[in-house]
Amino acid sequence: MKIALLQCNTVTGDVAGNAERILAAVREAAAQGADLCVTPELALCGVAPGSYLRAEDFAEGCKAGLQMLADALQDGPPLLVGAPVASVYASGLLSNAAILVQKGRWSVVSRKVYQTYGQDSEARFFDRGVSCGILALDGWRLGVVLCQESATEDGAFWKTQYASGHNPLMELVQRGVDAIVHMAAVPFSKGVQRLSEQMLSHVAARHHVHLFSVNMVGGNDSRVYNGQSLAFDPTGQILARGKAFAEDVLLVDTAGSGGIVHPRPACLPEA
């Protein structure tokens, strides 16, 4: 399988413009023979949408953006795109979700189960999902997780308190998957890239699965996202690394030699 990790620089609130940006990246990936394209978390609406989520017409705008992608990609490769959708609960909130766009239609694959709390609390704006989803494609079972849901269940890197009372990553593994698809928006800080690579490599090797992680790039308010999307084989060996602080379409061929492993920036030895 050839998976394209679409390392996007999307604009918060510009749903129509973001849909066009994503579409251009998908077309570039399709020209390279991609079987599946994946965006970062919340790529359609832009990361950290905050109060936009409370606007009455925002949800409708996101639905229109998804339909635009579906209409434009009727003959294109399947696309997993991050976007807010209606919650499964009658709360009036939206859920942070992974959406499959394929053959002129779109459907929800997974709603984010684990949410952050505190100052940047996602729980203020989003309803959590019930469980992570699995996408069956070309003989593969792909478990889909959103950002912090990739945290290891064995506490090898940090302890994560799942507010939902269950561990989404471990439940996916127990259901049987061939690969983990990780849609992320991880802000840059000193050492974060090295830690991410160590943790995701550990997850791939521990559960003997391929792992594909696509990260946001660009800036939003005080946050900067460094991209450097990643792919690992089932031994935890790195197959590909995306560009740092730049948009990228990172194609990973699981049947071949993997993909391009871009170096970490020399000026950021701890990045």
Regions found by a protein language model. Give the residues of each.
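Enzyme catalytic cores with a strong preference for nitrogen-chemistry domains
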Residues: M1-A271
